Amino acid sequence: MLFAVAFVILFTIGGFSGLMLAIAPADFQYHDTYFVVAHFHYVLVPGAIFGIFASAYFWLPKWTGHMYDETLGKTHFWLSFIGMNLAFFPMHFLGLAGMPRRIPDYALQFADFNMVSSIGAFLFGASQILFLVIVVKCIKGGEKASAQPWDGAEGLEWTVPSPAPYHTFATPPEVK
């Protein structure tokens, strides 16, 4: 749920920076700067990657038959959230200061924000190793997942044991 909520918040931030790019006089200044890179990544990373993580954590008990370690899952979320914001938020300021996109080397005045962005990118990347550890631990074992581990999940897939057996429905299920 944390990844789903963060998706909404961060996608909204990306959307608001897109509104700034829709204003012609401002876009003239921001065009081809790191502000566009920050906007793009604030829409893309939460929109795709955070959504994938939210769905992976939702379906992991059904796929593996075991619950994941929630403490590790929360740690993964916070490391990803902080790393993503450290990586991409400073790019707004770099773009507003005039740092162009697609350059092999940047002026020294941009070094501090680029260092913060680099640290954030490494943190975000390293936190994905933790996600792999969570998945492997879940596959290897742990607390058994019930057929319906989440409150409110009422679809047909939640009526069968976890993990779902082959030939799940020998007879067509009754849909109410």
Predicted regions span which residues?
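Interfacial and helix-entry/exit segments of alpha-helical transmembrane bundles
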Residues: 1-18, 34-37, 42-46, 50-89, ...
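Core, highly hydrophobic multi-pass alpha-helical transmembrane subunits of bioenergetic inner membranes
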Residues: 15-16, 76, 92, 108-115, ...
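Membrane-interface interhelical loops and short amphipathic "cap" helices
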Residues: 19-40, 66, 93-115
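Active-site proximal loops enriched in glycine and acidic residues that flank catalytic Cys/His/Asp
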Residues: 24, 44-46, 83, 90, ...
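Transmembrane alpha-helical segments in integral membrane proteins
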Residues: 52-62, 124-141
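The structured alpha-helical core of multi-pass membrane proteins
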Residues: 66-71, 82, 86-93, 104, ...
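Extramembrane terminal tails and long inter-domain/linker segments of multi-pass membrane proteins
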Residues: 97-109, 136-176
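Intrinsically disordered, flexible peripheral segments
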Residues: 114, 121-122
